[in-house]
Amino acid sequence: MERQFEIVSAYSPQGDQPVAIEKLVEGINSGKKKQVLLGATGTGKTFTISNVIKEVQKPTLVMAHNKTLAGQLYSELKDFFPNNAVEYFVSYYDYYQPEAYVPQTDTFIEKDAQINDEIDKLRHSATSALFERDDVIIVASVSCIYGLGSPEEYRELVVSLRVGMEKDRNQLLRELVDVQYGRNDIDFKRGTFRVRGDVVEIFPASLDEHCIRIEFFGDEIDRIREVNALTGEVLAEREHVAIFPASHFVTREEKMKVAIENIEKELEERLKELNENGKLLEAQRIEQRTRYDLEMMREMGFCSGIENYSRHLTLRPAGATPYTLLDYFPKDFLIVMDESHVSVPQVRAMYNGDQARKQVLVDHGFRLPSALDNRPLTFDEFEEKTNQVIYVSATPGPYELEQSPEVIEQIIRPTGLLDPPIDIRPIEGQIDDLLGEIQDRIAKNERVLITTLTKKMSEDLTDYLKDVGIKVTYLHSEIKTLERIEIIRDLRLGKFDVLVGINLLREGLDIPEVSLVAILDADKEGFLRSERSLIQTIGRAARNENGRVIMYADRITKSMGIAIEETKRRRSIQEAYNEEHGITPKTIQKGVRDVIRATTAAEEIETYEATPAKKMTKKEREKTIAKMEAEMKEAAKALDFERAAELRDLLLELKAEG
């Protein structure tokens, strides 16, 4: 019997949620490919999307722009759908340094990574769920557009076992080894099996506590049980079990032989090319590395960095689109792009960044040219693989608005909270004025967010506030994701009252205790003060009934004008609704959650060496400036303002020195 999506919640859709749900469902059922949900901060966008999933009954991929946000969405959707398969698929590296080569200093940086076992388990759980049931929601970061093994191969290599089935025990062991399970009778863990006489116990890659016990009677499977791996307690009797491969890059033996032949052919061609061009060191390097990998593949069936040979392993032609998580979904599935104003530019940028790094490795003999095909999807390929998409954002970007001219709005908050009123105050005397406002908020046990334009101003302001006895902390770009979540938690718990930063638009900053957002230098037009970032920043004060925004500015820029008008428009819609329904705004009561254990992001950033401009040639300087300007614009587009500001400062230095 087919399982249905069902929501378990004490709430029913409120405000303009019912209309948004109805329009989105109607659009999906009528075959619309792309829709936009403009949901103001705190209007319950996740609940709306959950109701849409329940109504359309389609497997769904929810894409978030980083691990932290994906973790939050995963927790929320798991609460709404406790009886369905809600899965989590993000990059499984706790720490990741991709392999790279710096020609200027002749430095090769080996790939260095720590794999998070918990996340690896969740990834396997996600892909196996897609082949076993229809009621699947996978919450993924944008890394889901990176190459994965072939879904056909993954499906075909499933070891399917039934009670009463004729099967030789040794044949089962061979099949398990073929799908990357290792025998380990001592340290029994995920991705291994152990043998005791006629009993084979298998620890599936997608589970962390339960294993499968297969009992043989001669050449027949007599019994299948689900067992607690630690205590041995029998949890359930099973008639059938499917053991999915322990790796997503799994290949049949006959395919592996063909792949090895093709890799050898490519190696010969590459060696000929390098030797003809007098690149003897590069030729020696690529031959040594590739021959070692081939030996490992012949003996073990895999090697370190096997994903770099994925084109050969899946027998695809050069330049062919790689397989990704999207290929594991059935044809008729739904994609929800959360915070689309950030995730769409991110998907666009991933291919170019990946190719630039790999091309250097290929040029200098660290990888074969086919490694360039182990890559994320290009934006056009991503578009081709999507079926129906809902873009969700409080400030949809130009691409989304172009794709779907009709925008479905969700402005009213179920709590009756309004978009905050905005004060504009002169820059002269702003710090003293702000200090008075902070003290008022502290007296009421409320919190304050302050956003500045530069790192120096953030640091100076933090030091000044500390000197006058305010409990304040500064949120800067060097702080890693988990630490960031802890700082936000401490702010909510009252360990400090004020948070200062350049980019207060990142995940997890919807804090009900915040009643004041102060925007310094609001009239300095630029990526830090664009209409979209101002609207997002204003939304940070919309979770408290006393929420207010102060913009310190000597004039009203075009971006400020648009942001202020849009906030007023939303506020008047909300006030009219509250009046009509007799609702009094009430601050959200939200428990302070502990840090999610599966969200440690590896933030990968290109660093620029501080080579004095005078030592660079004119051409080198121009090239560096162009590269930094392009990255600065990309960072600004993705609302990563600390990175953009850092690059802006470096650019100014470089131009001044030149």
From Swiss-Prot:
Coiled-coil regions, chain positions: none
Q: Domain Helicase ATP-binding: where?
A: 26-413
Residue intervals of the UVR domain: 622-657
Localization terms from the record: Cytoplasm
Motif Beta-hairpin extends across: 92-115
Query: What GO biological process terms are annotated to this protein in UniProt?
Result: nucleotide-excision repair, DNA damage recognition; SOS response
Which positions does UniProt annotate for ATP binding? Answer: G39, A40, T41, G42, T43, G44, K45, T46
Residues of the signal peptide: none
May I have one GO cellular component term? cytoplasm
What keywords sit in the KW lines? ATP-binding, Cytoplasm, DNA damage, DNA excision, DNA repair, Excision nuclease, Nucleotide-binding, SOS response
Gene Ontology molecular function, alphabetical: ATP binding; ATP hydrolysis activity; DNA binding; excinuclease ABC activity
UniProt-listed InterPro entries = Helicase/UvrB_N, Helicase_ATP-bd, Helicase_C-like, P-loop_NTPase, UVR_dom, UVR_dom_sf, UvrB, UvrB_inter
Which ranges carry the Helicase C-terminal domain? 430-596
**Alphabetized NCBIfam families for the sequence:** PRK05298.1, uvrb
State the oligomer form and interacting partners.
Forms a heterotetramer with UvrA during the search for lesions. Interacts with UvrC in an incision complex.
Annotated function: The UvrABC repair system catalyzes the recognition and processing of DNA lesions. A damage recognition complex composed of 2 UvrA and 2 UvrB subunits scans DNA for abnormalities. Upon binding of the UvrA(2)B(2) complex to a putative damaged site, the DNA wraps around one UvrB monomer. DNA wrap is dependent on ATP binding by UvrB and probably causes local melting of the DNA helix, facilitating insertion of UvrB beta-hairpin between the DNA strands. Then UvrB probes one DNA strand for the presence of a lesion.
Its UniProt domain note says: The beta-hairpin motif is involved in DNA binding.
Stated family: Belongs to the UvrB family.
Q: What is this protein called?
A: UvrABC system protein B
